[in-house]
């Protein structure tokens, strides 16, 4: 969304409101904030700890009680010519690295374990030894970037990719796990994995017979292959995953669904070409359907994907609308998790930055009632996004649509109340929305009515207070609104305040208009 002009729905803003560059910056900043929150929702690295009761895909193979060896004894055994001692040393190393707390990864690396493990990976005559070595390296690669780099620099990646074709499913699965940890370390490590043809290796592994635990690991690896920017992954490779990821959205497994959605959220967090590739994979109706799930671990990445898609072209946004996205977004605006409400409001704000037909679809879906509730009592981060949705509508909507915001959906009061926030960016968004409303009222001959409404709702007092704001843009915008619409000049004000003769008696404020029955409207 920060890559090119076409990446922002906000680019459709009119020149008299928020400028295009500012809105692109806003989309970029919001996406950065959302991307940071992913760390709470998805693990990029996973350690295979030594616990029989866990639902991890790989279990102890021999059921033997562990033999306690020192690190020096482990290394000596691994370097032995005796195959049984090699296996005992390798297994002991793996178990030490599989401790739930404080595994001695650096200690093992310092004792030269990694190159020995790499050598064992290539021992095709002993799949048990290969498996133990792969497991140990998986856990080393689950550590810090330096620890992962050690595994990469000893040329483990091509050996793991080769093991994807192993006849031992346990060994192939452990190789997938190791590659997932390596790819999850960052863009550079990810690209090393991709350039060793990992996609050629994993696609044949997915079929109707693939065990669920194995499938989960494969999809998690796929999500890490799609993740990270600066640079983004090579799209000529990643796009090969899209038909499979789209098909995986039909899975019944929560973990498979979640990781498939995360993968698509990473792909769509880019330019319109990549968004279109996801649209072409028929993923959108499936993503939209997943928005009605009860499981937040699925809703969050599915919503992120849909939110990214509506930052694309009008046609791409139309696919979301045609797939029934708006009613589901309306429900998510009422969700009990504030981060889901925030992202639903962010998604709606991008749709209202589109064309008038799309804004009408938002109106007809009843979403502005939900936005009003968010503005009134939602979490502040969600309120910010709701404010953008309103301001975008005042920018791009028809006069009838904008009037509906005020008269039908009663948005004005909670919208104005956000002028009290401490966040200058949000204040400016509300000020821009108000400026747009006044510009329309002027065209419709309703400026006086709108002024009275804003004043009755406390808006004038808030704007006057903002004239003392430390942010220059904020106080200049506040001054401009007051000066243009609320200031009639001193002479006129004095004339209004002077007593006038009415029916032979002096009255003050004799010329002040009386409020019409039913209140003020445009």
From Swiss-Prot:
Q: Which UniProt keywords apply?
A: Cytoplasm, Nucleus, Phosphoprotein, Protein transport, Repeat, Transport
Which tissues carry this protein? Predominantly expressed in the neuroblast stem cells.
Phosphoserine found at = 12, 17, 56, 65
Q: What does this protein do?
A: Binds specifically and directly to substrates containing either a simple or bipartite NLS motif. Promotes docking of import substrates to the nuclear envelope. Seems to act as a cytosolic receptor for both simple and bipartite NLS motifs.
Give one Pfam family, short name only: IBB
**Highest rank taxon of the organism:** Eukaryota
Q: Which GO terms describe its biological process?
A: female germline ring canal formation; gravitaxis; lymph gland development; NLS-bearing protein import into nucleus; sperm individualization
UniProt GO molecular function: nuclear import signal receptor activity; nuclear localization sequence binding
Q: Whom does it interact with, and what assembly results?
A: Forms a complex with importin beta subunit.
Where does this one sit in the cell? Cytoplasm; Nucleus
Start-end of each ARM repeat: 64-105, 106-148, 149-190, 191-233, 234-275, 276-317, 318-359, 360-400, 401-447, 448-489
Query: Does the record carry Cytoplasm as a key word?
Result: yes
| Cellular component annotations (GO), alphabetically ordered | cytoplasm; nucleus
Residues in IBB domain copies: 1-56
Q: Disordered: where is this region?
A: 1-28
PROSITE patterns per the record?
ARM_REPEAT, IBB
Family in the record:
Belongs to the importin alpha family.
| Protein name, per record | Importin subunit alpha
InterPro entries named in the record = ARM-like, ARM-type_fold, Arm_3, Armadillo, Importin-a_IBB, Importin-a_IBB_sf, Importin_alpha
- Comp. bias (Polar residues): 1-22
């Amino acid at each position: 969304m920060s890559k090119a002009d076409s990446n922002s729905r906000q680019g459709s803003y009119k020149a008299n409101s928020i400028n295009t560059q500012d809105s692109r910056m806003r989309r970029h900043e919001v996406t950065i904030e959302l991307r940071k929150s992913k760390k709470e929702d998805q693990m990029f690295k996973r350690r295979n700890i030594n616990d029989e009761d866990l639902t991890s895909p790989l279990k102890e193979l021999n059921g033997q009680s562990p033999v306690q060896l020192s690190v020096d004894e482990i290394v000596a055994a691994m370097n032995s010519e005796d195959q049984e001692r090699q296996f005992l040393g390798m297994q002991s190393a793996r178990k030490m690295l599989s401790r739930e707390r404080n595994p001695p990864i650096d200690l093992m690396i310092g004792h030269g374990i990694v190159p020995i493990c790499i050598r064992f990976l290539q021992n095709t005559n002993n799949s048990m030894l290969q498996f133990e070595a792969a497991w140990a390296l998986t856990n080393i690669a689950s550590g810090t970037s330096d620890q992962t780099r050690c595994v990469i620099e000893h040329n483990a990646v091509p050996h793991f990719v080769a093991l994807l074709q192993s006849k031992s499913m346990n060994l192939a699965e452990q190789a997938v796990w190791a590659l997932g940890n390596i790819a999850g370390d960052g863009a550079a490590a990810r690209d090393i994995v991709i350039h060793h043809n990992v996609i050629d290796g994993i696609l044949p592994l997915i079929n109707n017979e693939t065990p669920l635990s194995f499938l989960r690991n494969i999809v998690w690896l796929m999500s890490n292959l799609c993740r990270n920017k600066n640079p983004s992954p090579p799209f000529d490779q990643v796009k090969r995953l899209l038909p499979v990821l789209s098909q995986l959205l039909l899975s019944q497994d929560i973990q498979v669904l979640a990781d498939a959605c995360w993968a698509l959220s990473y792909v769509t967090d880019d330019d319109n070409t990549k968004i279109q590739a996801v649209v072409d994979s028929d993923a959108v109706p499936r993503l939209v359907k997943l928005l009605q799930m009860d499981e937040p671990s699925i809703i969050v990445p599915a919503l992120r994907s849909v939110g990214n898609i509506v930052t694309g072209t009008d046609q791409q946004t139309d696919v979301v609308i045609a797939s029934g996205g708006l009613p589901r977004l309306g429900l998510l605006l009422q969700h009990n998790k504030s981060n889901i409400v925030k992202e639903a409001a962010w998604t709606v704000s991008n749709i209202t930055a589109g064309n008038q037909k799309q804004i009408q679809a938002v109106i007809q879906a009843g979403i502005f009632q939900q936005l009003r509730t968010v503005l009134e009592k939602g979490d502040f981060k969600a309120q910010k996004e709701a404010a953008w949705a309103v301001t975008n509508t005042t920018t791009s909507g028809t006069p009838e649509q904008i009037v509906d915001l005020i008269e039908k959906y009663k948005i004005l009061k909670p919208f104005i109340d956000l002028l009290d926030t401490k966040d200058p960016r949000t204040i400016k968004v509300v000020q821009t929305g108000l400026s747009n409303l006044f510009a329309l009222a002027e065209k419709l001959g309703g400026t006086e009515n709108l002024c009275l409404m804003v004043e009755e709702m406390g808006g004038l007092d808030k704007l006057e207070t903002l004239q003392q704001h430390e942010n220059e843009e904020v106080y200049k915008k506040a001054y401009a609104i007051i000066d243009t619409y609320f200031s009639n000049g001193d002479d006129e004000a004095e004339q209004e305040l002077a007593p006038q003769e009415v029916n032979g008696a002096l009255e003050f404020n004799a010329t002040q208009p009386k409020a019409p029955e039913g209140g003020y409207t445009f």
